[in-house]
Amino acid sequence: MSSPAVARTSPGGSREMAPAPQGRGRFWEVGGGSGHRLERAAAESERWELLLRRGELLALGGHLKGALEAFAAALRRGAPARPECLGALVDCLVFNYRLRHGLGWSAAPVAGADGGAGGLLRCLGCRGFLSEPVTVPCGHSYCRRCLRRELRARCRLCRDRLPPATASATDAEGTAPRPPPLAAAIAASDFRTSVVLNHLAEKWFPGQRERARAAGRLGELLHQGRYREALAAACEALRAEPSDLIVKIYRAESYAGLQEFKAAIEDLNAVLFQLPDWPEVYFRKGKVLCDAGFLGDALQLFLQCLALDEDFAPAKLQVQKILCDLLLPENLKEGLKESSWSSLPCTKNRPFDFHSVMEESQSLNEPSPKQSEEIPEVTSEPVKGSLNRAQSAQSINSTEMPAREDCLKRVSSEPVLSVQEKGVLLKRKLSLLEQDVIVNEDGRNKLKKQGETPNEVCMFSLAYGDIPEELIDVSDFECSLCMRLFFEPVTTPCGHSFCKNCLERCLDHAPYCPLCKESLKEYLADRRYCVTQLLEELIVKYLPDELSERKKIYDEETAELSHLTKNVPIFVCTMAYPTVPCPLHVFEPRYRLMIRRSIQTGTKQFGMCVSDTQNSFADYGCMLQIRNVHFLPDGRSVVDTVGGKRFRVLKRGMKDGYCTADIEYLEDVKVENEDEIKNLRELHDLVYSQACSWFQNLRDRFRSQILQHFGSMPEREENLQAAPNGPAWCWWLLAVLPVDPRYQLSVLSMKSLKERLTKIQHILTYFSRDQSK
């Protein structure tokens, strides 16, 4: 390497080049090269970041081909291979997968739509028996197994976020997403089972409950990697109950753990033959194929799983990993493997590859913008490192189920789908024509028009049987606080159930469970109190008469609380005036209850009175209208109210710790004589001018505080007697004047506008003299 030259000036003034010192030359050379490389690296980094962003935007817009090209180009330019960055691409790929097969978006199922207790006591996640039920914050119930395995990211019915079992999941930015506090609290409590629902499941279906326990022990063996023991236990359980599909899935996992992929696929195919709409089975089958090295076939199964359930988190993660691996430059040229799976007699279709997907996506969507770099053509050569397996795909999938071929000629399916899996696509297409496919006992598909009721329908769970009448006991549905039938039952993170109103009243006093004393601070801060849907549905189905009587009592209590003249709730605190804002900080349990009842009944009103040494509160007060309530995490609240009608107390009372009263409303006596009206107008204008002068002469600090708390002074009104309480500025002025509350109370009780103006004039005259001094 030659040394760089250094310019120097000769004695004659001319410039000539001289070699630089060898050591310093090396320093300059390395420094200059490093700076150039840093600039080039920064430019490349900026370029691949733009490509990643471009790919994400194209994926969000539904342009699959352009998105794939952009992500592949970004990886070629040095972008880090992070699967979590491909969430939008996976969503776009699933969307195109649906379009290619005419699959409609699956509607949210209606809980209990299949009827019978077996349908009600069914997990919304795995569709199996609701063993160890856990009620999530949205009010729906899942079995503990589903929540611990994190099979779903969102609730299947309402799409609310489910509690994460671990904090290992990452979002698109690579950081762990923070779950809602209540969901995190449920996960931290190790998913406590719902005490009431668990008791009912054990009481009504002891056999199913015992089988679920055995399946739970199988899951623990698999989690510990003891596949031989799990396989032996699963085979023994299936000999006793051959129709237990959950155990059959566990046996398939045991086979997969022992590298016996053919046996695992056989079990999973048998499950799919009976339940063709079960996303988890497609995922398990995809995992088996992925472990066997057939990434292309596994990818299709993961996509089919997401097509049935877009919130199936493990499948989405697997697709992200596969896409990230396939888009790497060293793998992209080799493409997905066209396995012998696709050449099976029952699935003669073209193989799944990105090239065909991109071509079809162009016909389904608008053409994407041209990229500066082209993606290399995808070939049918195997993926590097994915074929080093002893078993072939055909030997793995050699098992076929009978009596399905005739129904599948009407629909085009993916090559990776076995015969029984094709029924899913047929079922989805028929559902668009308002028809359903049902599976009868003989295993044949038949069409059922909506409204018909078959004798026996194989849904997503086994028929658990009807409940004997002697097992239905109303005491199983009683709230432990009010000792009455559950009304709007809610379940806490610790698993206990109460009436919604009963629990709220307990939390007014302390943020702890009334039974186990576990902290419910997160539950209180969340303030959702979602009704436990399953518990309410069971009550509606099996205790309709008792529920009707309970609802009648509730309606009577609500009607009693809705009166605005009898038993009106009274907040004993300060003076309130018509049209004047009155913000309140509510922290006492009795007033928390009072405010909540005012909102729930719909009146959103209560009375405000000052305290009285003799009668607990004054004889006159003002109604307050709730405009907004801001709840604090510990249960306190800041209530924004404004004054309404004035009233006089007729009778005092007490209810649940707070004061009540029978009241009559006050209105100003109107003046009819024209001379009196003229005199009243002159007095009004004089006092208004005097009030404006007094307010303007206040110190800036006092004036700004008044404006901040009460707002600006209302304008004078043309019709003095239009409002039943007179001009609004009078009440605003009375609220800001620093006078004794007893004097203010006397003005509040006056029914004559003239007398009220005279009183205010006396006060202003007194304070104006002080200002002049």
From Swiss-Prot:
Residue numbers spanned by region Disordered: 1-29, 359-388
GO terms for MF: zinc ion binding
Species: Homo sapiens (Human)
Zinc-finger ranges (RING-type): 123-159, 479-517
Domain Lon N-terminal: 558-768
Keywords from the named record: Metal-binding, Phosphoprotein, Repeat, TPR repeat, Zinc, Zinc-finger
Matching SUPFAM superfamilies: PUA domain-like, RING/U-box, TPR-like
Biased composition (Polar residues): 359-370
CDD domains: RING-HC_LONFs_rpt2 (cd16514)
Pfam families: LON_substr_bdg, zf-C3HC4, zf-C3HC4_2
UniProt name for this protein: LON peptidase N-terminal domain and RING finger protein 1
GO cellular component, one term: cytosol
Source taxonomy: Eukaryota, Metazoa, Chordata, Craniata, Vertebrata
Modification sites for Phosphoserine: 431
TPR repeats: from-to residues: 48-81, 212-244, 246-278, 279-312
